[in-house]
Structure formats: structure tokens, C-alpha cells
From Swiss-Prot:
Induction (UniProt): Growth rate-dependent regulation of transcription. Is a novel example of a mRNA regulated through a mechanism similar to that of a stable RNA (rRNA).
Species the sequence originates in: Escherichia coli (strain K12)
Knockout-associated phenotype: Cells lacking this gene exhibit a lack of m5U modification in tmRNA.
Site residues by UniProt (Interaction with RNA): Q190, D299, R302
InterPro entries registered for this protein in UniProt: MeTrfase_TrmA_AS (IPR030390), MeTrfase_TrmA_CS (IPR030391), SAM-dependent_MTases_sf (IPR029063), TrmA_MeTrfase (IPR011869), U5_MeTrfase_fam (IPR010280)
Recorded GO MF terms: rRNA binding; tRNA (uracil(54)-C5)-methyltransferase activity, S-adenosyl methionine-dependent; tRNA binding
Residue sites binding S-adenosyl-L-methionine per the record: Q190, Y218, N223, E239, D299
Stated role: Dual-specificity methyltransferase that catalyzes the formation of 5-methyluridine at position 54 (m5U54) in all tRNAs, and that of position 341 (m5U341) in tmRNA (transfer-mRNA).
Keyword Transferase part of the UniProt annotation: yes
EC id: 2.1.1.-, 2.1.1.35
Official protein name in the record: tRNA/tmRNA (uracil-C(5))-methyltransferase
Protein family (similarity comment): Belongs to the class I-like SAM-binding methyltransferase superfamily. RNA M5U methyltransferase family. TrmA subfamily.
């Protein structure tokens, strides 16, 4: 695979290899055949980051080869959304001959939605001033004249200039209901929107008929907690990143959801609060004991669950675990399988043509 060519003819074979690999990894814990969710074969990534290479009068996007570290020129990127591809061409055309915008520009980040909105961030090794803002506004207006619904941001050391806003609003059809998700620049969002829809619908399916409340750790912008709210009496969710919490609060209001409570704290801190080890001012006014959480949802970072959180989640009758790293999932399952068994197993092909796998398991108490 090269950045400008996807081996789409190999899609089925690479997916089949992942299924075999996941089954092999899960064999000590389950003999289930994974439910398999396929990605679009191209234009599936909704965000991308590129370094910018200056070559005389020319400049262009590059990425670095992971093995050789050599740079690779990228003029089109079929893994990314069609909107990102349009913007890549338009941004280079708009910046190449503009001394103010191109000087010391070293990176461009793209974030797009299925609803055809975009935030483009230009990163600089220089101070950004009013002259930069004026030129950036002219570029933004020229892009919009090409029917590109785009917001531009300039970034430099300790500086962030938003010309309009630093977010876009995604609209996803999830099990017959449109969900609105505010996505903030430089915050985590699911990279493959089509796969995200399938993950949300799978999570809804496996929690059908749930009793009581849901507790979610690492909730981000509320991606899962808001979609799952319809299956539970109440949802209590934690997240540490301030921009994600603010986006989650917006998303609760935008989706007219009244049974979700977001708390800004780390999963480790919340574990201490639940176990009565520490009290936190942030929890004043929230009666943790009033929640009857029969199900806990975790979507941890690549490192998986720490040992304290492992112990905490074992107290819940049902554990829904979305993993972006099956190796750490299996490490967690060495502990979790002592008290719980795997009821459902899914493979989500979030990153086609790479070795990365995303998977989901539903665990129920033995």
C-alpha cells in the first residue's frame, strides 16, 4: 500500500486475515466466531494530518514511511474522505504562492464530517499576526466560493487563531435516529465515520432490553453514551479532557437527551470515588449511590484498563468493552474472565489495509 494507492482488490483477504488473528487471540477466552463489520474500501478516514515540505517555489503534503523514515509526497489520499482530497488540492493552491501563509508552515491537519463540514488547521514555526489573519480570511473566503464548507485555524507556539470556530457538527444515522455530534479540532473523534455508525448500532443491539443504569468511562464527546441512552434509565459518564466534556454537554442538548450526566474526571479518580477512597468537589450534587448501574461501558486508550479499573469493572453484571488494541484487551481478559464470560464478540475494520484491529466484547457475570 502507498499513500496514493489502496489495494482495494485485497480488501477481502486482509479482512479475513484479521478475523483469523482475532479468533486466535480470543481462543483462551471464547470460541465465538466474531461478528464482522466491514469498512468502505476507500474514502473512509474523516481526519488526516500531513507535514508540509518546502521544495524551492513548490510545497506539498508529505508523510514519513514508518520503516525507512523517508518522506513520501502525497498529492491525493484515497484513504481519506473525498472532502479532504478536495481540500488538499485547494489548500496547496491557495498557500503555494502566498508568502504570508506559506512562510514557516510545517503541518496541515484536516477534520471532516459525513455532513460535508471541515476544519483545517495550519501549524507554523512563527508568530501569527494580523497580516496572517487577513490572508487566512481571504483564503477561507476563496475556499467557500468553491462550495467548500470550511473553517480555518492557525496554530503556533502558545497561539491558536480561530477565524470562525474550532468545531464541526457531524450527523450520523444510528438505528433509525439521527445523532448530532460536535467534533472539536485537536480532540479525539472516531476516524472512520461509517465504522462508527456500525459500532454504535452493535453496542445498541447488545444492550437491548437492559435494566437499570449505564456507567461509561472515557466517554470523549459522548459518542457512545448518547447513542446508548435510549437503552438505559440513566447514563453516568466520565471524561478527563475539557474540550471533549464541553462537546459532550453540547451534544446532550443538541440531541434533546435528558438522562445523561457527564463528570470531568479520570477513570482512576472515579474508581477512587466509587470505592469511597476519596471525595471530589466535582461530584458534589451527584448522588453516586442513587445510580443502579448494571452495565459498565469502557473504551480505553491503547494501553487498556489499569489494574484498579479492572477490579472495579468486575463488580458490574455486564461489561461492554470496545478495544482499539486486542492485545491489551486479552491482557485485561486474563483478569475479567475469572468473573465474567464473553457473550458477544465483534471485529470492526476501522483501519483497512493495516494490522490494526478494533473489536468489541460483551461480558456477563458467571
Amino acid at each position: 500500500m502507498t499513500p496514493e494507492h489502496l489495494p482495494t482488490e485485497q480488501y477481502e483477504a486482509q479482512l479475513a486475515e484479521k478475523v483469523v488473528r482475532l479468533q486466535s487471540m480470543m481462543a483462551p477466552f471464547s470460541d465465538l466466531v466474531p461478528e464482522v463489520f466491514r469498512s468502505p474500501v476507500s474514502h473512509y478516514r474523516m481526519r488526516a494530518e500531513f507535514r508540509i515540505w518546502h521544495d524551492g517555489d513548490d510545497l506539498y503534503h508529505i508523510i514519513f514511511d514508518q520503516q525507512t523514515k523517508s518522506r513520501i509526497r502525497v498529492d491525493s489520499f484515497p484513504a481519506a474522505s473525498e472532502l479532504i482530497n478536495q481540500l488538499m488540492t485547494a489548500m496547496i493552491a491557495g498557500v503555494r504562492n502566498n508568502p504570508v501563509l506559506r512562510h514557516k508552515l510545517f503541518q496541515i491537519d484536516y477534520l471532516t464530517t459525513l455532513s460535508n463540514q471541515a476544519v483545517v488547521s495550519l501549524l507554523y514555526h512563527k508568530k501569527l499576526d494580523d497580516e496572517w489573519r487577513q490572508e487566512a480570511e481571504a483564503l477561507r473566503d476563496a475556499l467557500r466560493a468553491q462550495n467548500l464548507n470550511v473553517h480555518l485555524i492557525g496554530r503556533a507556539t502558545k497561539t491558536k487563531i480561530e477565524l470562525d470556530q474550532d468545531y464541526i457538527d457531524e450527523r450520523l444515522p444510528v438505528a433509525g435516529k439521527e445523532m448530532i455530534y460536535r467534533q472539536v479540532e485537536n480532540s479525539f473523534t472516531q476516524p472512520n465515520a461509517a465504522m462508527n455508525i456500525q459500532m454504535l448500532e452493535w453496542a445498541l443491539d447488545v444492550t437491548k432490553g437492559s435494566k437499570g443504569d449505564l456507567l461509561e468511562l472515557y466517554c470523549g464527546n459522548g459518542n457512545f453514551s448518547l447513542a446508548l441512552a435510549r437503552n438505559f434509565d440513566r447514563v453516568l459518564a466520565t471524561e478527563i479532557a475539557k474540550p471533549s466534556v464541553a462537546a459532550a454537554q453540547y451534544n446532550i442538548a443538541a440531541n434533546h437527551i435528558d438522562n445523561v450526566q457527564i463528570i470531568r474526571m479520570a477513570a482512576e479518580e472515579f474508581t477512587q470515588a466509587m470505592n469511597g477512597v476519596r471525595e471530589f468537589n466535582r461530584l458534589q450534587g451527584i448522588d453516586l449511590k442513587s445510580y443502579q448501574c448494571e452495565t459498565i461501558f469502557v473504551d480505553p486508550p491503547r494501553s487498556g484498563l489499569d489494574s484498579e479499573t479492572e477490579k472495579m469493572v468486575q463488580a458490574y453484571p455486564r461489561i461492554l468493552y470496545i478495544s482499539c488494541n486486542p492485545e491489551t484487551l486479552c491482557k485485561n481478559l486474563e483478569t475479567l474472565s475469572q468473573t465474567h464470560k464473553v457473550e458477544r464478540l465483534a471485529l470492526f475494520d476501522q483501519f483497512p489495509y493495516t494490522h490494526h484491529m478494533e473489536c468489541g466484547v460483551l461480558l456477563t457475570a458467571k
